[in-house]
Amino acid sequence: MEIELNRFTPAEQATFRLRALYEQAGYRKYRASRFEEYALYQEYQRFLPDAQVITFTDLDGKLRAIKPDVTLSIAKTAQPAAGECKRFYYNEEVCRPSRESHTFQTIHQMGLESMGAVDADEQAAVVRLALQSLAALNVPTVLEISHMGYLTGLLDALHVPAEARAKLLDFLRAKNAHELRTAALAAGLDESAAAALTGLLDLHGPLGATLTAARAACRCETQRAALEELQALQNALGEAGRGIRLDLSMADEMEYYNGLVFTGYVAGIPCAVLKGGRYDYLMQRFTPGANAIGFAIYLDELERLAAPLPPVQQQSREKSWLNIALPKGRLGDKAYKLLAGAGYSATEDYNDTRKLVVENPDACVRYFLVKPSDVAIYVEHGAADIGIVGKDILTESGADVYELLDTGMGKCRMCVAGPAGFTDDESRALRVATKFVNIARDHYERRGRDIDIVKLNGSIELAPILGLSDVIVDIVETGTTLKENDLTVIEEFMPISARFIANKASYKFKYAQLTELLNKMKEALAK
C-alpha cells in the first residue's frame, strides 16, 4: 500500500523522506535514551547550546538529566576503531530552555553523524546529504558554509587579545560593522587590523567568487589551509554544489565547531532549519584521533510551512516584497521620510490613515506601523524583513537579527541617574529602577555590583524621588526631565541611536532587494 505523503504535516513528510535518504546512504538509526547521567553534560558543558538542563535524582540515587543534545550521547558510545568511520542518523526530541518563554521546551530534531576516519570525501558526502535534505523539503532553500579556520586564523594573525574576542565575535554574528570597528580599535588594534575584521562582512556570496575574494584577503597559512579545504569541497561537490553560498563572517558556536560549518534556510521560515559542521575536538575527547561531522534539522520549524499566508501577502505572491517594520512616533516619521526620499514612499501617507499597513506596489515595499518595543520581535520572527529600532530596545530584547546600519537618528544615551550628591553605599544591594532590566543587570554584573531591580514601565524618574529606588537606569536625551526633578546623571554607559536590522532568513532570500534599499538609505543619510 502506497502512503500519500500529502496527508501528513511538512515535518512528518520530511521524516519519511529523510529516513529513506539516510538509510540509502548507509547510515544506521541511533536510538538515544531519554535520560543521561548529569555528569556527562556537566563535564562537556562548553559543547552544549545552553548550560541549563533539567535534572532529577533517579530511583538508583544517580543524578540524571533529560537530554538536551543527541550528538554527545552518540559520540560517547560510537568508539570507532582506527581507520573506521561509523555513520548514524537519529530522529529524537531534546529539551532546551527557550529564550522567549523562559521555560524549557522540547525540540524535534532529525540529523546524522559521521564519526571516526572523516576525510575530505566523507566531508563532501555529508555536505551533499545536507543539500539533499534541504531539497527533500520541496521548497526554495539556501545552504551557507564557512570555515572556522579562516576566522580563527585572522584573529591570531591580528593578535586580537583573548579577552576581546567574545565581543568582536558577537558583532560579527550580527553583521554589525559599525560597532565591530569601534570594539576592534578599543581592543588596541590599529585601523588596518580593524578594517581586516570588518572586511570579513564583505566575504559572502556565491562559493566560487567569494573564495577568490577571500584568497586576496589572507594573512596567514591557517586561512590559506581553510580556503584549500573549501576549494576541495567545491571540486568534490561539482554541479551539486552550485547553489552553495560562502559566508566567512559566520562565527556561531566556535567552542563546538573547529572546521567546516554550514547552515540551511528555507523560504518562509524566519530562522535556520539546518545546522552542522566539523566537531573534531569534542569527538577526540571520547575517541583520541577520531574526527566527526554531522548536522541536525529542526523539524518543528517546518510546521510553519503548513500555515496559510498572512492576508497582506496573499494578493502579492507573484512578486517578492520587502516588509518593513517602522516604530510609531518621531523615529518612525524620520525613518519613513528618509526611505520615501530614497524612492520607497507608500502610495498613501500613513500619518493620514488609520491603517497599520501601507504599501507601494511599484517599489514592492510594505510598511508595518508597530509599537517601538515590538519592532525587533516582528523582524526576528519574520513578519517583517527589515526594521528601524533603537539600540536600547534591540539590546534589551536580545533579538537574533542582523544589525546592518547605525542610522545616527534618535541619538541619546543610556545612563545611571540619581539624586544630586548621591553616594553609593556598597555595604548593601543597590536598588535600581528601570524598564531596561537586562541592560541594567548586564551593566552592574560587569562592575561586580550587587543590585535589586525594580521593574517599571514609565515615569522612571519618580522612583528615587519617592524612595522606591536609589538610582534609575534609563535613556537620556536632553536631561531636562532629570534637572526639573532634582536628579543628575551619575554615569553614561551606552550610546543609543536607531539601527537598521534585518531578519536572518530574509537576508539570504531577499539579499539583492535588501542591500539595494540599504545602500540608498546610506546615500540619503550622507546628504
Regions found by a protein language model. Name each.
Residues 1-67, 124, 128:
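TRNA-binding/sensing appendages of the translation machinery
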Residues 7-25, 36-37, 71-82, 89-140, ...:
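Positively charged, Gly/Ser-enriched RNA/tRNA-binding surfaces
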Residues 52-101, 375, 380-389:
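Glycine-rich, N-terminal phosphate-binding loop and its surrounding beta-alpha-beta segment
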Residues 60-62, 114-120, 506:
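A generic structural motif
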